[in-house]
A protein has these predicted regions:
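Secretory targeting and sorting signals
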Residues: 1-15
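Conserved aromatic anchor
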Residues: 37-52
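Short beta-strand segments within Ig-like beta-sandwich modules, predominantly Fibronectin type-III
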Residues: 68-76
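Extracellular fibronectin type III
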Residues: 102-120
Length: 122
């Protein structure tokens, strides 16, 4: 992307680089439902072409509905979070990495047994 600025002194070009590339899809390494609709989820850290890993965020979805987000706190064991499910019973969990430009990755990968958790009432 290039931006052209016109002034009395003549045109001046300002070159900028837009980030259109999404981060890599995270991989769910742990997802478990607990009582009172609590969800603990952990993912391996994603990578991005421009945003450092420490600045990526992760949106958490249950049955396609966003229920929260996680920040990368620099842990070597991945990114972990406690979220709250919206209903009891089976919930399909997916996670998407988001870079500083707002690009979202493809949905998380991982074994299907990891992605479906049960929400338990209080």
């Amino acid at each position: 992307m290039a931006i052209l600025s016109l002034s009395a002194a003549g045109p001046a070009a300002l070159a900028t680089s837009a980030d259109w590339t999404p981060p890599s899809a995270p991989r769910i390494v742990y997802a478990q439902g607990y009582y009172c609709l609590t969800l603990i989820v952990g993912v391996d850290r994603s990578t991005d072409d421009q945003t450092p890993q420490s600045q990526l965020t992760y949106d958490v979805f249950a049955d396609g509905r966003r229920i929260g987000s996680m920040a990368d706190l620099g842990s070597t064991s991945g990114v972990w979070s406690i979220q709250h499910l919206t209903h009891t019973g089976p919930n399909t969990i997916t996670v998407k990495a988001v870079d500083a430009a707002g690009n979202r990755s493809a949905p998380s990968t991982g074994p299907s047994t990891t992605n479906v958790v049960t929400g338990y009432p209080c």
